UniProtKB/Swiss-Prot annotation:
Biotechnology: Introduction of a non-canonical amino acid into the protein alters the substrate specificity of the enzyme and achieves levels of activity toward a new substrate that are otherwise unattainable by mutagenesis to any of the canonical amino acids. By modifying Phe-190 to a 2,3-dihydroxypropyl cysteine, the formation of 3-deoxy-2-heptulosonic acid (DHA) from erythrose and pyruvate is significantly increased.
Family listed: Belongs to the DapA family. NanA subfamily.
Superkingdom as given in the UniProt entry: Bacteria
Organism: Staphylococcus aureus (strain NCTC 8325 / PS 47)
Annotated keywords: Carbohydrate metabolism, Cytoplasm, Lyase, Schiff base
Gene name of this polypeptide: nanA
Quaternary structure and partners: Homotetramer.
Pfam families in the cross-refs: DHDPS (PF00701)
Record has Zinc as a keyword: no
Regulation affecting activity: Strongly inhibited by sialic acid alditol.
Residues the record marks as active site: Y137, K165
Name of the featured protein: N-acetylneuraminate lyase
EC number: 4.1.3.3
SMART domains to which the protein is assigned, alphabetical: DHDPS
Length: 293
């Protein structure tokens, strides 16, 4: 516990069968691929990329357990436990903490127009119940929740709120957060903006495409930190070509198809997501070949 949490993480994909059940063997393969093949520093488990909000509580626990079994103590593990049901978030947080996850993360409560005080207390309640470190998951495009610099300050006053997963295009706010809180962890959540985020001083990044493009992301991150911006941007252009094509075909089914191409039992997306559209097969094959995926 309490490892240095800086670095690059796969936002772990989760394979499902045709009945929407977790494929445990495939999940272990996906986790091991992220660490052994993509050479990432850790896993961010049960986030958006794991289709978390389509899972019941027992399935979420199953994913936490299997991911931990797959990689053990070799890498850093962050458990996303956020839920509209605070009791579930606490239950999941306790479970992940008992499994040995290095930190918790929680998406801001969404759908209902919660006040900041309600959002703040949601985080404080999870921390009090689990006594684990917390990383705020800020993703306003999906939650509709925008946290101001003043509100970040109030959250960061809690010693166990150690950082933020920042998935937002507002680089002015990112710069303000970095300047105001130099000792807090900032992990970028936008794969397509890794160069810009690194220049802005983030400590690492969490990405869904890092499941298949992690080595290229590592080069981008390292080059940008070394001031080799032109070289980093060239690789970012390549990554964004990959991302743009993947998004056009459906992100989760397409990433799973790339993993399947590697011999990994990557399963299906969970309904109502649809499986990979075979009409895109030629485009996918060309993408894999061109970018050595």
């Amino acid at each position: 516990m309490n490892k240095d949490l800086k670095g690059l993480y796969a936002a772990l994909l989760v394979p499902f069968d045709e009945n929407g059940q977790v494929n445990e063997q495939g999940l272990k393969q996906i986790a091991q691929n992220a660490i052994e093949t993509e050479e990432l520093d850790g896993l961010y488990v049960n986030g958006s990329s794991g289709e978390n909000f389509l899972l019941n509580t027992e399935q979420k626990k199953q994913v936490f357990k299997v991911a931990k079994e797959a990689v053990g103590d070799k890498v850093k593990l962050i458990a996303q436990v956020g839920s509209l049901d605070l009791n579930e978030a606490i239950e999941l947080g306790k479970y992940a903490t008992e499994l040995g996850y290095d930190a918790l993360s929680a998406v801001t409560p969404f759908y209902y127009p919660f006040t900041f005080e309600e959002i703040r207390d949601y985080y404080f309640d999870i921390i009090e119940a689990t006594q684990n470190n917390m990383i705020i998951y800020a993703i306003p495009d999906l939650t509709g929740v925008n946290i101001s610099i003043e509100q970040f300050s109030e959250l960061f006053n809690h010693e166990k709120i150690v950082g933020v997963k920042y998935t937002a295009p507002n680089f002015f706010l990112l710069e303000r957060i970095r300047k105001a809180f130099p000792d807090k962890l900032i992990l970028s959540g936008f794969d397509e903006m890794l160069v810009q985020a690194t220049i802005s001083g983030v400590d690492g990044a969490i990405g869904s495409t890092y499941n298949v493009n992690g080595r290229r992301a590592r080069k981008i991150f390292d080059l940008a930190r070394q001031g080799q911006i032109q070289e980093a941007y060239q690789l970012q252009h390549d990554s964004n070509d990959i991302i743009e094509t993947v998004l056009s075909m459906g992100i989760y089914p397409t990433l799973k198809e790339i993993l399947r191409h590697r011999g990994i039992d990557a399963g299906l997306p969970k309904r109502p997501f649809k499986p990979f559209n075979e009409a895109h097969r030629q485009t996918l094959d060309q993408l894999i070949a061109k970018y050595d995926l």
